[in-house]
């Protein structure tokens, strides 16, 4: 078993993406890709496909550095030699939701709203996208990334972005060479002598960020 001491917590931001187009009737749809729903769909696909870059760095790197010597087989070899096996390990970690969240600011498409009648083309379509910010990334950086991706799918005068209230930056990373970390480390080892103790990243949101 492994016991992870949380040394940082990811940030939180939800952004509303709103697309506008000329409303109309479904009997005479506009040119391909120009309706509000079509542009929103293209923008969301781009945000899903072109997420913020990930990597084994920061808290994740420190966690694997700590755990690697205690592992066996190829896992020990790979995690102890990320300079060589880094791309392979990263691809493997990105394949699972729980470990992918350790490597990057995640993008989650959570709400979509558009239209209210089956034969009417709406003049507006919007979606909410939730981001969990990795330490080192910022709210402004995420908005810039999002704006850049959406502008590849829709004209800039057809969309707007705004962050919902309650957004918070990622926490600072607590040092692992502090007296507090050493005390927690020692206590955990005394209570759970078989556990591997390592620094960890809290990928969800808690009151601890305050």
Where are each of the predicted segments found?
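Short, solvent-exposed beta-strand/turn "edge" segments of beta-rich domains on protein surfaces
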Residues: 8, 29-33, 100, 116-123
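A short core secondary-structure module
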Residues: 27-52
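Short amphipathic alpha-helices in soluble, non-transmembrane regions
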Residues: 43, 142-151
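Solvent-exposed, non-transmembrane alpha-helical starts
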Residues: 29-30, 137-142
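Hydrophobic core residues within well-ordered beta-strands of beta-rich domains
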Residues: 13, 125-127
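Histidine/acidic-residue-rich, glycine-tolerant segments that coordinate divalent metal ions
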Residues: 1-34
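An extended, acidic, His-containing surface patch that forms the Zn2+-binding/catalytic region
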Residues: 56-116, 123, 140-144, 158-210
């Amino acid at each position: 078993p492994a016991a992870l001491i949380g040394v940082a917590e990811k940030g939180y931001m939800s952004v509303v993406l709103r697309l506008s187009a000329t409303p109309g009737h479904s009997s005479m749809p506009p040119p391909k890709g120009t309706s509000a729903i079509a542009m929103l769909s293209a923008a969301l696909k781009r945000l899903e496909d072109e997420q913020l870059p990930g990597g084994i760095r920061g808290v994740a790197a420190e966690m694997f550095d700590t755990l690697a010597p205690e592992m066996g087989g190829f896992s020990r070899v790979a995690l102890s030699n990320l300079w060589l096996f880094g791309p392979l390990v990263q691809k493997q970690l990105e394949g699972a939701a729980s470990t992918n969240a350790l490597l990057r600011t995640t993008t989650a498409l959570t709400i979509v709203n558009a239209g209210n009648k089956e034969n009417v083309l709406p003049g507006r379509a919007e979606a909410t996208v939730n981001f969990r910010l990795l330490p080192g990334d910022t709210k402004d950086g995420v908005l810039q990334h999002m704006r850049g991706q959406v502008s590849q799918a829709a004209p800039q005068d057809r969309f707007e972005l705004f962050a919902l209230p309650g957004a918070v930056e990622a926490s600072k990373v607590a040092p692992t060479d502090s007296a507090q970390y050493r005390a927690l480390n020692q206590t955990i080892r005394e209570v759970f002598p078989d556990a591997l103790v390592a620094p960890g990243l809290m990928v969800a949101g808690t009151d601890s960020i305050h």
